[in-house]
């Protein structure tokens, strides 16, 4: 009986040891997986000296589901998309766009975004609703055609607490604008940092245009902005 017990013990030890070995191999394989690279959009704009706007409210942006994700999506000219799981935004692209649109407008206008600040009413404010139908990184066999394609529309609505609710209260209180453009990616450098830098430049153009539309509405003037249609 003692010999049988020893054999059983020896067999159990081997099985257990084999299980530990496989677990170690599995963990080693997992640890060797590529480490993702993370990128952020960063608005870099120059302040407007003539801005009198003090309060804005930047709402979450609209963005197609196909690109509203953390992994960076590259699209080719045929419409085929490639999701880069190891090249990622630090948050979803929609959040990156909203947060940096807000940061850029605050810097550009010298204003405070009350959307997340808890600031109450009492001052004239401007609510900005933005919808990106395109913010696509487009790859091409022809390096000269690599670009970030942008199509964006926005509505700026003025909230003036001093205006009473009468038949004229909606006059000059809202402005709707749209723009589309391509931002070329430098053909001499296809690194992801250059792609992200180009996306930043594209966002900066949007920030500049939105800021000028807010300034126009604040001054009760028609918005005349290069490459932008406003009604």
Give the location of each predicted region.
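Sec-dependent bacterial lipoprotein signal peptides
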Residues: 1-30
């Amino acid at each position: 009986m003692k010999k049988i017990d020893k054999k059983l013990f020896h067999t159990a030890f081997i099985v257990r040891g084999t299980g530990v070995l496989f677990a170690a191999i599995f963990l080693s394989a997992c640890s060797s997986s590529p480490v993702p690279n993370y990128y952020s959009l960063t608005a870099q704009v120059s302040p407007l000296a003539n801005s009198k706007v003090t309060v804005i409210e930047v709402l979450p942006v609209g963005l197609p589901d196909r690109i509203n994700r953390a992994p960076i999506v590259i699209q080719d000219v045929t419409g085929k998309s490639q999701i880069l799981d190891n090249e990622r935004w630090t948050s979803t692209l929609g959040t990156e766009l909203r947060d940096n649109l807000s940061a850029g407008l605050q810097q550009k206008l010298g204003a405070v975004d009350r959307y997340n600040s808890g600031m109450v009413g009492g001052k004239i404010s401007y609510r900005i609703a933005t919808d990106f139908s395109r913010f696509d990184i487009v790859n091409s066999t022809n390096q000269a055609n690599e670009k970030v394609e942008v199509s964006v529309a926005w509505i700026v609505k003025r909230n003036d607490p001093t205006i009473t609710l009468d038949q004229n209260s909606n006059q000059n209180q809202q402005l709707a604008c749209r723009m589309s453009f391509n931002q070329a990616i430098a053909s001499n450098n296809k690194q992801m940092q250059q792609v992200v830098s180009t996306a930043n430049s594209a966002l900066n153009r949007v920030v500049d245009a939105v800021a000028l539309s807010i300034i126009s509405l604040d001054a009760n003037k028609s918005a005349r902005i290069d490459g932008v249609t406003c009604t």
